[in-house]
Amino acid sequence: MAGVAACLGETSTAFARQPEPTPGKALNLMTFNLRYASSTGANRWPLRRPLVAQVLREQSPDIVGTQEGLYPQLKDIATDSPGLGWIGLGRDGGSRGEFMAVFYRKERLEPVEFDHFWLSDTPEVMGSTTWGNTNRRMVTWVTFEDRATGRRFQFWNTHFDHQVEEARRKAAALVSARIARVPQGVPVVLAGDFNALSGKSRSYEWLTGEGGLKDTWHAAARRSEEDADSFNDFRDLGRNGQRIDWILFRGSARVASAGVVTTRVNGQWPSDHCPVTARLEWE
């Protein structure tokens, strides 16, 4: 299903033969739960919008997997960051509901194909829920061609349920099975808000066990804000090293760094989640 995109292409499961990558071309990756836009309250979107723009400007990501963004909110981000294109579909269909929008740096990356599916027993049914969760959950994935290297890879973006553990476990199994269908020569990044602690949850164990994915956090040569929690809840930042936002990957890669972005201005957070970043180079 084609969503809102800066570049509309035909969705297919065909993959071209992968050219060899060019060394020295690392990608800056980010996962960022935006917190849906609200027009009232101390954390309303008009107050947070310039901080989101600041984070994106300072971190200069090549790809950002966002969660919870609403259509007008995503358009604001695109306006504030003109170097970024984006692809997404509302989880309720069209522009309705929260998006798993993928932003990408247009001068660096070319989207080749993209699609969406829902985290349920009927993943092709738009807005479907079958695992006891009341919120609809989905995945948006994009195949990119790196203009700097000619290499193609996939970026998957998701948001697991915040209430039902069984829904998270089944989501991990479904996502793992879908990624396994991607030809082995194609590297894959899976990013998102998983609503579960890294290293201490069944969904993490499944994705990094049977799913065969690696965590950029543990693969990184260095880490910044290592003890920071990725969920701040618009309060003082916890320092327990609890990450519910992850960037996982499949393929041979060198991860130079990973970190939690703790930007806060005059007590105002950009979101109730801190962005998590990784700098990765395919080998």
Annotate each PLM feature.
Residues 21-24, 57-58, 79-81, 93-96, ...:
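Extracellular/periplasmic catalytic domains that process cell-envelope and extracellular macromolecules
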Residues 27-34, 52-77, 103, 142, ...:
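Active-site beta-strand/loop signature of hydrolases that rely on acidic residues for catalysis
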Residues 4-80, 91-98, 173, 283:
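N-terminal, active-site-proximal structural segment of metallo-dependent hydrolase catalytic domains
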